[in-house]
Amino acid sequence: RPAGSEPIPLVFVASAGGGIRAAYWTTIVLNCLVKNQDNAGWKPIGMDMNNVCTHRMSMDSVFLASGISGGSLGLAVTKAFKDAPAVPWSEPLGKDFLGPTVAGVAFRDLPNAFVRLRATGQDSAAVLEKSWEKSVRDAKGDLESGFLATAWSTPARLDFPLLALSGTSVTDGCRVTVSALKLADADAA
């Protein structure tokens, strides 16, 4: 930092799982903490956020944001809108994501379980992911560039916050963390 300037806080964010509710609250809390957001007239939970959010910081102060499940989605959406301060980050998460998923289960997966047709198209998880991507894209955000591509603003400069998104492997139940950071040696696992 330049001599005589204010210290820059180093912030780590952890976001718990809990589905779309965790994603929504993650974006609301981060929107409240980051000072480059314009909250004029924004009342996501029935209150004026400018009266609630009094201490703001720069998004670049957040070094690493880690989450699991819905918390990971909230962090990814937040990063997708990092440079779009006019859009409340939680806006894309207020859409109907259950409808397309239920339709896929009811009209493709369930009949296929009985008649063993080779159903083409996406499975329910892919339908849900595509609906998240579409919702963010409709709000002028970007979830589709690729996870690692968004970590670098230029080939020589990381774009903060770095994300460490966790999940569980369906094959063995072990935790899986995806990040642009090298968090452990592959041989240590």
How would you name each of these model-derived features?
Residues 1-189:
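Catalytic domains of lipid- and phosphate-ester/thioester hydrolases
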